[in-house]
């Protein structure tokens, strides 16, 4: 960005650079292109576009959204005599009772980690706060809150400590995500929080044993919570009028309903648009992904996850 030597299309990702790029003046405001094409603009929620805006102008076009929930191992639940809830455990206490039951059968209940961003522990932590009533949910949907000393945050921290102490693997403290995911693939833990991008790994014999996909079920976090946040969108890095038009045309192509479904089927990317009709063929070819799409509407609480790694 500082050099000004940008490609015509700038891919944006986890390290959201929208504001930085917009401030630099090196990327193009694409608000007018959205306004001139209402059908395209309708693909995105106001929240999606606001997230990709700077000073009221849209600079990024999101190609997916980020959600996460709990994956569980059906065989391990059966071994423990547990029946998984259709949607979610009603309360965290109910969830802990299930963890105690799993533990009594010598089954490690959950995957957690602390290295790097502590991704898995972060998702548990976000859920603990985000489902703690209106106040907790508001906190988890506030960007850069200034007060982390409220009772609900303190309580969530204590609950996370409880999970690390009692319900996870011995290598969780200091452990990296990849190792903890492998524990789940190898049926060494019963539950792991993550998003739909992980589903293709369940089918890959490079990651998981053959047939593992059929062992996996999903549920929302206790209290029917689900992380759901907009994602940083791709930007136009040219000022040449003809190249801008071509870049916008590509962004439109990239976000057609057909291509959003292709990204879902091939890479597990969640469609950014909520008005896409999911074909019956997906229910046959990838029933777990179809279940992910179905369960989203049953979430009582939705929230972000960034707050958990600001501590």
Question: Where are the language model's segments positioned?
Answer:
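Short helix-initiation/N-cap motifs at beta->coil->alpha
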Residues: 1, 15-16, 89-96, 171-185
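Conserved N-terminal structural module of periplasmic/extracytoplasmic solute-binding proteins
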Residues: 1-24, 35-42, 84-85, 223-225, ...
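A structural signal for short loop-to-beta-strand junctions that line the ligand-binding cleft
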Residues: 7-8, 39-77, 98, 109-112, ...
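Hinge/lid segment of periplasmic solute-binding proteins
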Residues: 13-68, 96-97, 123, 213-217, ...
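C-terminal capping/gating helix-and-loop segments adjacent to ligand/active sites or protein-protein/ligand interfaces
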Residues: 53, 228, 270-277, 288-311
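Extracytoplasmic/periplasmic solute-binding protein
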Residues: 54-63, 68, 78, 93-145, ...
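Extracytoplasmic/periplasmic substrate-recognition and gating elements
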Residues: 80-83, 165-166, 205-270
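Glycine-centered hinge/linker elements that transmit conformational signals in sensory
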Residues: 97-101, 141-174
């Amino acid at each position: 960005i500082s050099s000004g030597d940008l490609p015509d299309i700038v891919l944006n990702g986890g390290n959201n650079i929208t504001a930085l790029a917009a401030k630099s003046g090196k990327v193009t405001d694409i608000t007018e292109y959205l306004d001139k094409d209402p059908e395209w603009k309708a693909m995105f929620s106001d929240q999606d576009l606001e997230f990709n805006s700077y000073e009221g102008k849209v600079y990024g076009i999101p190609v997916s959204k980020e959600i996460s929930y709990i994956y569980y191992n059906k065989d391990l639940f059966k071994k423990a005599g547990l029946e998984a809830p259709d949607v979610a455990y009603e309360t965290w206490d109910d969830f802990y009772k299930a963890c105690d039951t799993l533990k009594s059968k010598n089954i490690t209940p959950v995957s957690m980690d602390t290295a790097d961003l502590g991704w898995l522990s972060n998702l548990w932590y976000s859920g603990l706060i985000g489902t703690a009533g209106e106040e907790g949910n508001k906190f988890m949907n506030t960007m850069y809150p200034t007060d982390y000393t409220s009772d609900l945050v303190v309580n969530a921290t204590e609950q996370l400590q409880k999970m690390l102490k009692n319900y996870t693997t011995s290598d969780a403290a200091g452990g990296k995500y990849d190792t903890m995911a492998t524990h789940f693939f190898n049926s060494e833990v019963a539950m792991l929080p993550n998003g739909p991008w992980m589903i293709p790994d369940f089918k890959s014999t490079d990651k998981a044993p053959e047939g593992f996909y059929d062992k996996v079920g999903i549920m929302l976090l206790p209290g029917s919570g689900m992380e759901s946040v907009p994602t940083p969108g791709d930007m136009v890095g040219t000022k040449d009028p003809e190249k801008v038009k071509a870049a916008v045309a590509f962004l439109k192509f990239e976000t057609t309903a057909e291509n959003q479904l292709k990204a879902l089927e091939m890479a597990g990317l969640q469609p950014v648009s909520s008005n896409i009709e999911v074909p019956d063929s997906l229910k046959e070819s990838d029933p777990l992904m179809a279940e992910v799409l179905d369960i989203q509407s049953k979430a009582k609480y939705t929230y972000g996850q960034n707050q958990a790694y600001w501590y």
